[in-house]
Swiss-Prot record:
Record's subcellular location: Plastid, Chloroplast thylakoid membrane
Family: Belongs to the complex I 49 kDa subunit family.
Protein name as annotated: NAD(P)H-quinone oxidoreductase subunit H, chloroplastic
Protein species of origin: Buxus microphylla
Catalytic activity line of the entry: a plastoquinone + NADH + (n+1) H(+)(in) = a plastoquinol + NAD(+) + n H(+)(out); a plastoquinone + NADPH + (n+1) H(+)(in) = a plastoquinol + NADP(+) + n H(+)(out)
UniProt gene name: ndhH
Any single GO BP term: photosynthesis, light reaction
Lineage: Eukaryota, Viridiplantae, Streptophyta, Embryophyta, Tracheophyta
GO MF, any single term: quinone binding
């Protein structure tokens, strides 16, 4: 009698592309030995739209609506980096009031991004309830955005030298009310999630990254701070008016998925502290630098000639980017979002290189999931927090 032999071939499984409402159009080719992950190969590019090349054929103001499609859950940060680069090239000063408004909008956007990370992350590991809770607070933030900018998601609010419009009457009081309410919401999340034994079983000790390893991989944001590295560009680069406020860099030393969760939960509380201080200390004055208008090149345009005088026209403001290069970065919710800009005495950038945090943080995924269980892939991928719009650009 012949004994049947057991086949030991690896199983190759396609995970994704996922729906954009979850982790985006990311495809993972996973090699499995039973439930154990042997190899994982991410396939990118499904959402590539040529954002860098588009930037080289647009003025800064024309390009501003495009950038909100990178990380479409934290659009204030993509607008901020797009505006900060030409501001530094032209040495343009931002009024105090505008700087305070920017900080408020950035921190509200950080909270909204972390909330929409928390809900799907919990759904990935089997907890559906928080997915609905986070939308309650997120809608309140979007109501504030809509009142100030007119848009709930793609705001198009930042401008070179300031912001597009001042805060409407009563907005500051509504925002302060939201801050008081949201602090109780964070406490509720921590009671529900942080000490939940089922949650801890899924995330504790899963996807561990050491501090030196995180630096070598070029990780940033909560991925880096959860590995024991106290690095936050708001403290390091002193941009906008963050130095005027009292807040702490949130970090953990364990480096696992639980540590990354704790960092993001703590960051939401710190963002509320920053917003409250910015609202209470917001000065009067202009919300934009009116001197920027003297840099406008459209007054010399042929469209201002005699024969075009009866045509109604409202050109977008443009000015030349001087012939130099610089790298500008901000601390986005997912990590270091940077722009390498090269000017060429033209209204168009000669080179516009995007440094997306999600793309670089994603590179460590294959190493983290090796020798883990299949179910741990979604836990680790969720803890990285990626948006494919900025990964593929």
């Amino acid at each position: 009698m012949t004994v049947p032999s057991t086949r030991k071939d690896l199983i190759i499984v396609n995970m994704g592309p996922h729906h954009p409402s979850m982790h985006g159009v990311l495809r993972l080719i996973v090699s499995l030995d039973g439930e154990d992950v042997i190899d994982c190969e991410p396939i990118l590019g499904y959402l590539h739209r040529g954002m860098e090349k588009i930037a080289e054929n647009r003025t800064i103001i024309q390009y501003l609506p495009y950038v909100t499609r990178w990380d479409y859950l934290a659009t204030m940060f993509t607008e901020a980096i797009t505006i900060n680069a030409p501001e530094q090239l032209g040495n343009i000063q931002v009024p105090k009031r505008a700087s305070h408004i920017r900080v408020i909008m950035l921190e509200l956007s950080r909270i909204a991004s972390h909330l929409l990370w928390l809900g799907p992350f919990m759904a990935d590991i089997g907890a559906q309830t928080p997915f609905f809770y986070i939308f309650r607070e997120r809608e309140l933030i979007y109501d504030l955005f809509e009142a100030a900018t007119g848009m709930r998601m793609m705001h198009n609010y930042f401008r070179i030298g300031g912001v597009a419009a001042d805060l409407p009457h009563g907005w500051i009081d509504k925002c302060l009310d939201f801050c008081d309410y949201f602090l109780t919401g964070v406490v509720e999340y921590q009671k529900l999630i942080t000490r939940n034994p089922v949650f801890l079983e899924r995330v504790e000790g899963v996807g561990i990254i050491g501090g030196e390893e995180a630096i070598n991989w070029g990780l940033s944001g909560p991925m880096l701070r959860a590995s024991g590295i106290q690095w936050d560009l708001r403290k390091v680069d002193h941009y906008e008016c963050y130095d005027e406020f009292d807040w702490e860099v949130q970090w953990q030393k364990e480096g696992d998925s639980l540590a990354r969760y704790l960092v993001r939960i703590s960051e939401m509380t710190e963002s509320i502290k920053i917003i409250q201080q910015a609202l209470e200390g917001i000065p009067g004055g202009p919300y934009e630098n009116l001197e920027v208008r003297r840099l406008d090149r459209t007054k010399d345009s042929e469209w201002n000639d005699f024969e075009y005088r009866f045509i109604s026209k409202k050109p977008s403001p443009t000015f030349e980017l001087s012939k130099q290069e610089l790298y500008v970065r901000v601390e986005a919710p997912k990590g270091e979002l940077g722009i390498f800009l090269i000017g060429d005495q033209s209204v168009f950038p000669w080179r516009w290189k995007i440094r997306p945090p999600g793309f670089i943080n994603l590179q460590i995924l294959p190493q983290l999931v090796k020798r883990m269980k299949l179910a741990d892939i979604m836990t680790i991928l969720g803890s990285i927090d990626i948006i494919m719009g900025e990964v593929d650009r």
